[in-house]
Amino acid sequence: MASASGAENSSVPPSPLPPPPPPQIHTSRTKLSHHHHNNNNNNNNNIDSTSKAIAQYTEDARLHAVFEQSGESGRSFDYSQSIRVTSESVPEQQITAYLLKIQRGGFIQPFGSMIAVDEPSFRILAYSDNARDMLGITPQSVPSLDDKNDAAFALGTDIRTLFTHSSAVLLEKAFSAREISLMNPIWIHSRTSGKPFYGILHRIDVGIVIDLEPARTEDPALSIAGAVQSQKLAVRAISQLQSLPGGDVKLLCDTVVESVRELTGYDRVMVYRFHEDEHGEVVAETKRPDLEPYIGLHYPATDIPQASRFLFKQNRVRMIVDCHASAVRVVQDEALVQPLCLVGSTLRAPHGCHAQYMANMGSTASLVMAVIINGNDEEGVGGRTSMRLWGLVVCHHTSARCIPFPLRYACEFLMQAFGLQLNMELQLAAQSLEKRVLRTQTLLCDMLLRDSPTGIVTQSPSIMDLVKCDGAALYYQGNYYPLGVTPTEAQIRDIIEWLLAFHRDSTGLSTDSLADAGYPGAASLGDAVCGMAVAYITEKDFLFWFRSHTAKEIKWGGAKHHPEDKDDGQRMHPRSSFKAFLEVVKSRSLPWENAEMDAIHSLQLILRDSFKDAEHSNSKAVLDPRMSELELQGVDELSSVAREMVRLIETATAPIFAVDVDGRINGWNAKVSELTGLPVEEAMGKSLVRDLVFKESEETVDKLLSRALKGEEDKNVEIKMRTFGPEHQNKAVFVVVNACSSKDYTNNVVGVCFVGQDVTGQKIVMDKFINIQGDYKAIVHNPNPLIPPIFASDDNTCCLEWNTAMEKLTGWSRADVIGKMLVGEVFGSCCQLKGSDSITKFMIVLHNALGGHDTDRFPFSFLDRYGKHVQAFLTANKRVNMDGQIIGAFCFLQIVSPELQQALKAQRQQEKNSFARMKELAYICQGVKNPLSGIRFTNSLLEATCLSNEQKQFLETSAACEKQMLKIIHDVDIESIEDGSLELEKGEFLLGNVINAVVSQVMLLLRERNLQLIRDIPEEIKTLAVYGDQLRIQQVLSDFLLNIVRYAPSPDGWVEIHVHPRIKQISDGLTLLHAEFRMVCPGEGLPPELIQNMFNNSGWGTQEGLGLSMSRKILKLMNGEVQYIREAQRCYFYVLLELPVTRRSSKKC
């Protein structure tokens, strides 16, 4: 409502918001969980956020009415009492009146004047009472020969007659602009007095509002220089923000308050953050030493009205010059249906309660700036990323203070950069939190595998480490396992009874107030347990997390009561806000954040499976075949994306080439072949460093390769490449490249890919410019297509060069842009940029060049004169005179080809899919361990029972299969298989056990496909003991046999496994088994593409192909070999393997 932040600023948009329905005000946050929790999580969050906003609109309106009534009756307004939560409904008319009062109050601040104008006719529709005096126009002016005194000022007057001719031209030009705000400020002079003003324009529903702020100089050139100087200061502050170490939001906020105070000179500057429950907190502060600190102060949500927050996303800067000054009335045409909308005006007067609040805290002036970050993608409209008001940067001064518009504009740029930097930090923090939660979940899963479910509360880490809480508990099989601050066992049983009685159909519940959630025993728990999150594991087993009341977490350096503040709790003041906040959160905990609930829900799903396994430990676990289908689908998707990316790279108009780990070319597209004159077949295998680049680039390329092979990727590096063939005559080609580490799907670096941009033409221009300054104009304006688009600025960022290529690219002629400000006028009004963030980034690049810091290949996009989207890379270099002084900036554009954009997009998509599949693979490997543990446990139980020989054989076969699966899961190391460095674990084993395990793995598929299995296996081989890696042999043979079964004709077909052993005696006494395995089926057998995948070393196309390829390589490591043979009526795998026979078997032989 009234806030120390001065954020009374905003209100509703020009077309009033529909009055929200008057719901019951209920600020506790209680949510039920269901099985579809994750699917609708973001939608639920949005609905919850909207309902909270509607509730706050209603409460804002109620408080506004109480304040107004207290003024009329002469009673004091007791803020801390009025803000207490109430279920009182608010009439719709009262809400409408509140919104109208804030939006169309009819008064402005007296430090400037306001005129509203009908857009087509320039006719005055409304004006502030002080406009005449400020412009120097008096009603008593006596007509004279000097027409300067003939200006008439009244409703219906053409506003152009009030200003000089040049000012009228500027107004006409601004009125015709598509985005009028980008023209601000307009430098205009009163026709009568000659006084200069900043004209700040914005459109409303009935016309254009012009805020007139007196300027401090009469020379517009000095004004431009002052604006540029303000921008330079802002850019310096932005550079400081960008140079900060990552991962520290507090440091970022501390730095921005220092920068803003240095820029503006206010006595106090704060960063005010909005929490998820809409209340606010001062998280950073810099101030005059004698002022009371506000760091750590929390405000109730109603301190910043919802209407104000909404408009802060459109109107990002709000200044109050003097809260004690009398507001100036706005006079308007009677034909207007409703009072003039002032929400976008820089002059709008503060509301009475806000002025009173500022006066009570000893603040006279304020400047408030919005901090905007990206919201949830789901909230965006029309494909655009939504924006969220994260908080405010608030400036206070103990005396009247007015900041000129150029400096406010520079501060707004600083806020945009702060928002971008903050957004990155928050994303990194969220990712870090997610990793920590995943790590904790993994450790908890390992505990469940090694121990009973109670391990998650008896060992470290425990469930308390999963989310921030004061206590946690597990209720399992009627036993209570508490940790930290928790209810007693009797109380927890009572809570469970309440949950089952009122929330049985849900899978969980979270609340910040058990009392408001309806639990009747909440009072007996006291402040120690206010908030609770519970996850139902089974009908009788539960997980709990508990939080104490919020006030326990709140610390404020200024909260100490001063004896002289006798009315501290009643008057509107930061102390009463803090008291009101503590009243609001009484018996409440901090709310449970969405990320925390996601972590709880994930653990809930894991525990359900674990508890089921514990309950059914004697049953055999079966792996869900859908996992295999999911992997296959993912592989197919990746394969499709990979093929499309290869096609795009081959046909791209940008040079793209790749090398292996030895730096030799293994990829060379058509464009780089065209530039260098070197055909792809000749380029393959050449050394990039020794054969393809000039000597002066060898060291650069060598470093690029070395870093990229370590996973450290560099961007925008220029290399000088050789050319070949008689047409090129050993000329140089200059390419700016990005080095990308090429990784296989196990995330190991296997080479480097270079995506480049040919800058030979630009290099020629730059060299000629440096060496032959006299040829400057001839070079820049040469229509030769090799000359890139070029524009330049003076040291005030005004455009002074715009070459032929820029005219052709943008559709704007040189005459249209010369002399205009590059930021705002040229790029902004003429060539529209996408959003204020793009303008901020362009301004930073331009000012960096003016400061001597060049920028290479900055992504830059805009709309040309005809609305066509242009994407380019911007290179900005300083311009210097003969004495070496910087006098402006040179800018070059490199146009991005659609093919390259598409190729890069496909590459990013492939990397995204690869990462997703890697996560799925890691999840599957982790998930499979649990049922395998069950199988192992079942086998151990069966071993202790009386079994027949046949049953023992079945058990041995099951154990062999289980060990094979564990081996594959633990040793997912494809790189070592590829390069032949896989370590084999050899030992003695019976060959018959291996054959039994191999056959068992295809029996289900044989039955499903109605196939007959023919075994031609000599009896003596089953008892033969040999030496080797049993599990790898088992893996290889089962993979070959399984593929034969898959492609055998069905139904009523057959599959044969034939083993032919031969014993060979070696001279030194060693006995070798020479075993031939044939896996046979009739018909056409495996598809040729699959066999090609199996024997192809360069890659794989399908899941089966990868498996066969890996099996062939593992077999080769064991000195074996495999062939696939097609005969007239049948096909088969022919596997040869030699294994040493152990002494035990040698004696039998």
Swiss-Prot record:
Ligand binding (phytochromobilin): 353
SUPFAM superfamilies referenced in this protein's UniProt entry, alphabetically: ATPase domain of HSP90 chaperone/DNA topoisomerase II/histidine kinase, GAF domain-like, PYP-like sensor domain (PAS domain)
InterPro entries: GAF (IPR003018), GAF-like_dom_sf (IPR029016), HATPase_C_sf (IPR036890), His_kinase_dom (IPR005467), HisK_dim/P_dom (IPR003661), PAS (IPR000014), PAS-like_dom_sf (IPR035965), PAS_2 (IPR013654)
Processing and modification events after translation: Contains one covalently linked phytochromobilin chromophore.
Entry keywords, A to Z: Chromophore, Photoreceptor protein, Phytochrome signaling pathway, Receptor, Repeat, Sensory transduction, Transcription, Transcription regulation
The species this protein was found in: Glycine max (Soybean)
Protein name in the entry: Phytochrome B-2
Chain ranges of the GAF domain: 267-449
Keyword Repeat: yes
GO cellular component: nucleus
GO molecular function terms attached to this record: phosphorelay sensor kinase activity; photoreceptor activity; protein homodimerization activity
Any one biological process term the GO annotation gives: detection of visible light
Stretches the record annotates as Disordered: 1-48
